[in-house]
Amino acid sequence: MFMGEFEHSLDSKGRLIIPSKFRDQLDSNFVVTRGLDGCLFVYPLSEWRLVEEKLSQLPSNKKNNRAFVRFMFADAVQCDFDKQGRIIIPKKLRLHAELQKECVLVGVSNRVEIWNKARWEETIEETEENFDDIAENLIDFGL
Protein backbone atom coordinates (compact mmCIF):
# COMPACT_ATOMS: atom_id res chain seq x y z
CA MET A 1 0.00 0.00 0.00
CA PHE A 2 1.31 3.43 -0.94
CA MET A 3 1.03 6.29 1.54
CA GLY A 4 2.90 9.44 2.42
CA GLU A 5 3.88 12.65 0.68
CA PHE A 6 7.32 13.53 -0.69
CA GLU A 7 8.73 16.55 -2.51
CA HIS A 8 11.34 16.09 -5.24
CA SER A 9 12.67 18.15 -8.11
CA LEU A 10 12.19 17.38 -11.78
CA ASP A 11 15.43 17.94 -13.68
CA SER A 12 15.79 19.56 -17.11
CA LYS A 13 15.72 16.14 -18.81
CA GLY A 14 12.35 15.23 -17.27
CA ARG A 15 13.82 12.88 -14.66
CA LEU A 16 12.27 12.59 -11.22
CA ILE A 17 13.56 10.73 -8.18
CA ILE A 18 11.04 8.26 -6.79
CA PRO A 19 11.31 7.88 -3.00
CA SER A 20 12.80 4.54 -1.94
CA LYS A 21 9.63 3.81 0.06
CA PHE A 22 7.70 3.84 -3.24
CA ARG A 23 10.44 2.21 -5.36
CA ASP A 24 10.37 -0.88 -3.16
CA GLN A 25 6.66 -1.38 -3.87
CA LEU A 26 6.79 -0.51 -7.58
CA ASP A 27 9.35 -3.23 -8.33
CA SER A 28 11.34 -2.80 -11.52
CA ASN A 29 8.50 -2.23 -14.00
CA PHE A 30 5.47 0.00 -13.57
CA VAL A 31 3.12 2.19 -15.59
CA VAL A 32 2.80 5.99 -15.61
CA THR A 33 -0.31 7.50 -17.15
CA ARG A 34 -2.48 10.58 -17.10
CA GLY A 35 -4.41 10.87 -13.88
CA LEU A 36 -7.48 12.74 -12.79
CA ASP A 37 -7.43 16.27 -11.35
CA GLY A 38 -4.34 17.15 -13.39
CA CYS A 39 -1.85 14.71 -11.87
CA LEU A 40 -0.12 11.54 -13.08
CA PHE A 41 -0.95 8.06 -11.83
CA VAL A 42 1.84 5.53 -11.25
CA TYR A 43 0.78 1.89 -10.92
CA PRO A 44 2.81 -1.23 -10.17
CA LEU A 45 2.49 -3.49 -13.20
CA SER A 46 0.35 -5.99 -11.26
CA GLU A 47 -2.08 -3.23 -10.24
CA TRP A 48 -2.12 -1.78 -13.78
CA ARG A 49 -3.23 -5.18 -15.08
CA LEU A 50 -6.22 -5.04 -12.70
CA VAL A 51 -7.08 -1.52 -13.92
CA GLU A 52 -6.70 -2.71 -17.50
CA GLU A 53 -9.02 -5.65 -16.86
CA LYS A 54 -11.70 -3.45 -15.30
CA LEU A 55 -11.50 -0.89 -18.10
CA SER A 56 -11.77 -3.61 -20.75
CA GLN A 57 -15.10 -4.65 -19.20
CA LEU A 58 -16.69 -1.24 -19.71
CA PRO A 59 -19.34 -1.32 -22.43
CA SER A 60 -17.73 0.25 -25.49
CA ASN A 61 -21.07 1.41 -26.89
CA LYS A 62 -21.02 4.37 -24.48
CA LYS A 63 -19.09 7.41 -25.61
CA ASN A 64 -17.88 8.37 -22.10
CA ASN A 65 -16.49 4.87 -21.54
CA ARG A 66 -14.54 4.98 -24.80
CA ALA A 67 -13.22 8.44 -23.98
CA PHE A 68 -12.08 7.42 -20.50
CA VAL A 69 -10.32 4.28 -21.74
CA ARG A 70 -8.52 6.36 -24.37
CA PHE A 71 -7.58 8.92 -21.72
CA MET A 72 -5.99 6.24 -19.53
CA PHE A 73 -4.21 4.28 -22.26
CA ALA A 74 -3.18 6.79 -24.93
CA ASP A 75 -0.18 8.20 -23.11
CA ALA A 76 0.48 5.36 -20.66
CA VAL A 77 4.11 4.26 -20.59
CA GLN A 78 5.83 1.35 -18.96
CA CYS A 79 8.84 2.64 -17.02
CA ASP A 80 11.77 1.47 -15.00
CA PHE A 81 14.29 3.16 -12.71
CA ASP A 82 17.76 4.34 -13.59
CA LYS A 83 20.67 3.65 -11.23
CA GLN A 84 19.80 6.75 -9.16
CA GLY A 85 16.18 5.69 -8.63
CA ARG A 86 14.82 8.19 -11.17
CA ILE A 87 12.25 7.82 -13.90
CA ILE A 88 11.99 9.77 -17.12
CA ILE A 89 8.56 11.32 -17.48
CA PRO A 90 7.68 11.81 -21.16
CA LYS A 91 7.02 15.38 -22.25
CA LYS A 92 3.35 14.75 -23.04
CA LEU A 93 2.73 13.51 -19.49
CA ARG A 94 4.72 16.40 -18.01
CA LEU A 95 2.49 18.80 -19.96
CA HIS A 96 -0.69 17.07 -18.78
CA ALA A 97 0.31 17.49 -15.12
CA GLU A 98 1.99 20.86 -15.72
CA LEU A 99 5.08 19.47 -14.01
CA GLN A 100 7.82 21.97 -13.44
CA LYS A 101 10.80 21.83 -11.12
CA GLU A 102 8.92 21.29 -7.84
CA CYS A 103 6.87 18.08 -7.71
CA VAL A 104 4.99 16.24 -4.99
CA LEU A 105 4.66 12.46 -4.96
CA VAL A 106 1.71 11.16 -2.97
CA GLY A 107 0.95 7.58 -2.00
CA VAL A 108 -2.74 6.83 -2.54
CA SER A 109 -3.46 3.21 -1.60
CA ASN A 110 -2.82 1.23 -4.80
CA ARG A 111 -0.97 3.94 -6.73
CA VAL A 112 1.37 6.91 -6.52
CA GLU A 113 0.29 10.32 -7.81
CA ILE A 114 2.74 12.89 -9.18
CA TRP A 115 1.64 16.51 -8.84
CA ASN A 116 2.81 19.97 -9.74
CA LYS A 117 3.55 21.34 -6.26
CA ALA A 118 1.37 24.46 -6.61
CA ARG A 119 -1.58 22.44 -7.96
CA TRP A 120 -1.20 19.93 -5.11
CA GLU A 121 -1.28 22.71 -2.53
CA GLU A 122 -4.44 24.15 -4.10
CA THR A 123 -6.07 20.71 -4.16
CA ILE A 124 -5.24 20.03 -0.51
CA GLU A 125 -6.49 23.47 0.54
CA GLU A 126 -9.78 22.90 -1.29
CA THR A 127 -10.13 19.43 0.24
CA GLU A 128 -9.50 20.77 3.74
CA GLU A 129 -12.14 23.48 3.24
CA ASN A 130 -14.70 20.84 2.20
CA PHE A 131 -13.53 18.00 4.42
CA ASP A 132 -16.65 17.80 6.59
CA ASP A 133 -18.92 17.52 3.54
CA ILE A 134 -16.63 14.94 1.95
CA ALA A 135 -16.50 12.91 5.17
CA GLU A 136 -20.27 13.05 5.53
CA ASN A 137 -20.70 11.50 2.08
CA LEU A 138 -18.24 8.72 2.91
CA ILE A 139 -20.12 7.69 6.04
CA ASP A 140 -22.60 5.97 3.72
CA PHE A 141 -19.74 3.61 2.75
CA GLY A 142 -18.98 2.70 6.34
CA LEU A 143 -15.89 4.88 6.70
UniProtKB/Swiss-Prot annotation:
The keyword DNA-binding applies. CDD domains: MraZ_C, MraZ_N. Its main location: cytoplasm. It is found in: Cytoplasm, Nucleoid. Pfam families: MraZ. Belongs to the MraZ family. Forms oligomers. NCBIfam families: division/cell wall cluster transcriptional repressor MraZ. GO terms for molecular function: DNA-binding transcription factor activity; transcription cis-regulatory region binding. Keywords: Cytoplasm, DNA-binding, Repeat, Transcription, Transcription regulation. Residues 5-47, 76-119 form the SpoVT-AbrB domain. This is Transcriptional regulator MraZ.
